[in-house]
Amino acid sequence: MKLTYIAVLSLIVSLLSPLQLMGAETIEYDVKGLQADAEIRIDHWGVPHIYAQKHYDAFFVQGFNAARDRLWQIDLWRRRGLGELSEVLGPAFVEQDTAARLFLYRGSMFSEWLAYGSDAKRIAQAFTAGINAYVDLIDRQPDLLPLEFKLLGYQPSKWVASDPVRIRSNGLWRNVVTEVRRATIACEHGLQVDAIIKKLEPDWVTTVPLGLDPCDIPKDVLKLYSLSKAPVDFRLAVQFQPPSSKAQSNALPQVDHSRTLALLSDQLIDAGSNNWAVAPGKTNTGRPILANDPHRGHAVPSLRYIAHLVAPGINVIGAGEPGLPGISIGHNETIAFGLTIFSIDQEDLIVYDQRRKGNKYQYRYQDKWVDMKTHVDEIKVKGQKSVSVPLLFTRDGPVIYKNRKQAFAVRAAWLQPGMAPYFGSIEYMRAQNWDEFLAALNRWGAPAENQVYADTQGNIGYKPAGLTPIRTNYDGLLPVPGNGTYKWHGFYDMDQLPAQYNPKNGYVATANAMSLPKDYPYKEKIIGFEWANPWRINRIREVLESSSQHKMSTSIDLQRDYVSLPARRLLTQINISELPSPANALFSQWNYQLGKDSSAATLFEVWMNRHFTPMVIATVTGIDDPSALASLDNLSAIDEFEKFSDANKIQIVSDSILEAILDVEALMGADPMLWQW
């Protein structure tokens, strides 16, 4: 039987409101690539429910429908990830394309597919074939082409099965950025200052690796690294039009990417997530409740894409990403699953001595000069000739920066086989019980995740997952020399990460905070030391432990909970009546809720972030403007504040709150009733 025959794909668009049926429209498409007829039903929320008669047809239709709804978004995602923006947007994007190509997966595709499970390649083939089927449909019906393509003057590309897994730039990467920041602080002020600015957990004191001079790290060493995952700044396409003169056809513009990198910084602000699962014994239904709220920036179109896949062997609904097959957050008929980031340190910045010998670049490794590997990529450029770009690699990874004496490369676990971000969900979303779920997570690579679990039998569980490098003689918190002294000695088996199954307390919960058990041998098996502050997880635990009759509505309320634990901890140590007006009146009546119309919340947040925290850190470190070094940690600030004498506490509070009041008045006027957070 042929697998590629013309079948009918019925698209039923149900125009339902919550109150009444407005009507229904049925559209039929003739699509090559399906094994049997399939159907998409769109509910009143806009969620596609995909019904297929064959297992892999569900993924084909998922790809088709993702293209039908989000073609320009996923086409742009593919071009950005593969380094093909210049072909359609012009010469201003050559450097960003170069950066993206440095971080493509370039290893064995056999090993890559095998790492995800037995049918990963087949799923990717079906999904990308579905996307291509919609692109073919546009060729036959040009009126279906999304407006963005028309405005920018190009056509959507065809996909190959390897595209979604070769792209690694859509993950939430870890910790090269903080390594460089820490090196800068160590150079200018000493590591003792960094320990105050950001707490390390579990309790840890880092040291400068032998042979590293922190002052050798260039300020812009991470430009290509950051560009590789930066969003697309379309202003550059307008600003740098392809030259009209043939004599200039090979000239590339000098592009300032500061705005592009600022867009990336905006995306990463306050990134974080929460999840929890409550056991039947603590709910009012006698069944487990699982909740997950990933905190990613609002965007149009959205990062997430909700879908429901039904076919033999699969019935799963939830959220994934439009350019990937499967569901990463959701449930099937027997299990539910949700994720947050778990801070495994999966990166190192490697510093080499380097030289040029003839037409080769070399780096020093174990007292020998070793040739860098060179890949020459051809980047197509709109309106110009293609550009040949040499990409350099060491034994550790791609070279992102070099000067006359040194070269800098990134060693990253997520460049290993099986590490395409979120692609591993195709395995665990089909699990039917805890053991199958664990088995799937033991193959999960990136990004490192806290997974919570619940099933229809009443079980709950928690399992972190991600590829964890084995570091035996360093902690990964600073760049390291590339001379062979600081190596990874493979990776830990996934089952060595801690797990919980039906814990006695009746719930599991995570919020990006440090979640290693107290008896975990963190000094011998280093996972990472950089976690989110514990405010969110402490609030979640507080609520979940306060009742044995947890409801669905309790989880919904907790996802929208605005109680500020920093405010409660700090203000209970202060004599509020002695604060200047209007702080005394606002704080004395405040319930610590960060409501958008709360004048007290407005004043507190401006005070805490702009004045109190910088003033405390400046007092402890002696640095006039510590906020210029890094994002300051309010947990560290409160910890340090609590060590002050009573007189110093009064002085800090008095000075900083007065500055905050003036700041808010300048922003929103003198009437506190008009202050809004």
Give names to the regions the model predicted.
Residues C187-V193, K199, D203, K246, ...:
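Ordered core of a single globular domain
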Residues N315-V316, G320-S386, I426-R430:
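Compact, glycine/acidic-enriched structural inserts
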Residues I6-P18:
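Bacterial N-terminal signal peptides
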